[in-house]
Amino acid sequence: MSSQPLSVVIITKNAATQLAECLDSASFADETLVVDSGSTDGTAELAAQHGARVVQKEWLGFGRQKQFAVEAARNDWVLCLDADERVSTPLRTRILAVLAAPAAQAYAMPRCNRFMGRWLRHGEGYPDWSLRLFDRRHARWSDDPVHEKVLTDGPVARIKGDLLHDTAETLAGYLDKQNRYTSMQAELLFKAGKRAGVALLLLSPALRFAKF
């Protein structure tokens, strides 16, 4: 049986400073697809220079945007990455082994986060199991605009090898990112008729980070 062809899909918005390393780490894939939502920093041009197929799509929210990318891919097996993530060499080896003889339709991998130059391999933050490799005929992204997840019609297997995640390099960048996420979460709660205290929205990400 021949190996299953793989598409790596990445959604982007002004990610030029991070994307090149991500694309280089995914160069083993049969296709790399970048779905961009109107970047103004040369992200789309950079992706094309690295051999990626680039599609423009207005922002739909994280879940729907990622599912659009999955459906636009040319292959059924997809690996979903963020622009600030890298496929480590051990993970690449395991992915290729899985594609040679898939035993499941979806695979989670350990994600290792780096904050301010330090890899966080202790506490709650590691291994941050992330379901990113799957056969799109048996799995899809949820429609959630934030805190999206992959929904499958079968069991999820695990593979070794770190997915490397470069988080914000500065505390200011980290807090800015958390502010954007909590704003989106607050809007979702409001639309659902729920209320969350300001203290909870502000402290939850900080308390979680303190456990790393």
List where the protein language model places each region.
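Acidic helix N-cap motif at the loop->helix transition within catalytic regions
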Residues: A20, D41-H50, P90-L91
